[in-house]
Every structure is written in C-alpha cells, then in structure tokens.
From Swiss-Prot:
InterPro entries: Bombyxin, Bombyxin_A, Insulin-like, Insulin-like_sf, Insulin_CS, Insulin_family. Silk worm has two kinds of PTTH: 4K-PTTH and 22K-PTTH; there are many forms of 4K-PTTH. It is found in: Secreted. Keywords: Cleavage on pair of basic residues, Disulfide bond, Hormone, Pyrrolidone carboxylic acid, Secreted, Signal. Heterodimer of a B chain and an A chain linked by two disulfide bonds. Disulfide bonds join 29-79, 41-92, 78-83. Brain peptide responsible for activation of prothoracic glands to produce ecdysone in insects. Coiled coil: none annotated. The lineage of its organism: Eukaryota, Metazoa, Ecdysozoa, Arthropoda, Hexapoda. Gene3D superfamilies: Insulin-like. The modification Pyrrolidone carboxylic acid is found at residue 20. Transmembrane segments: none annotated. This is Bombyxin A-1.
C-alpha cells in the first residue's frame, strides 16, 4: 500500500513539474528596457517611492532598505544578460 502511494505521489509530482513552463528570458536595452519596465510597473499598479516617504515614519532602520537592489542595476541584469519578467517587476 505504501509503495502504491509513493508511486502515485511521484507520478503526480512528475506531471506537475512537466506542466510548469519556465519563464522566458529576454534582453532589454535602451528605450525598449524603459518602455517595457514602464508598461509592467503600470500594469502592476506600482509607483516608485522616494526615500522621503520612509523618513516620515521616523524609522532610521528603514533607510538602508529604501536604496533598492544595491550596486547592480537593471542594465546589469537585463541588458548585459537576459532576464525574466519577474526580475523586471522587482525594479518597480
């Protein structure tokens, strides 16, 4: 009985993995990068916030996190190398 359950679980896992499509990656540079990012952020309903909004809370510990993704930028991740839509959305 345990063997049948294990086989059924394994088959369902294999079928689930086979139905998952990997995200396509593209290279976005220049105006194409800017337009794609603007469209994605607009569709997601995300507005870029300034650091001044975090300062209004009076929490100094939030300021280091308001700087974004660090020294590597969107050009490093999406122009020099292909990136997915999820990576682009992380810059909204």
């Amino acid at each position: 009985m345990k063997i049948l359950l294990a086989i059924a679980l394994m088959l369902s896992t294999v079928m689930w993995v086979s139905t998952q499509q990997p995200q396509r990656v593209h290279t976005y540079c220049g105006r194409h990068l800017a337009r794609t990012l603007a469209d994605l952020c607009w569709e997601a309903g995300v507005d870029k916030r300034s650091g001044a909004q975090f300062a209004s809370y009076g929490s100094a510990w939030l300021m280091p996190y308001s700087e974004g993704r660090g020294k590597r930028g969107i050009v490093d991740e999406c122009c020099l190398r292909p990136c997915s839509v999820d990576v682009l959305l992380s810059y909204c």
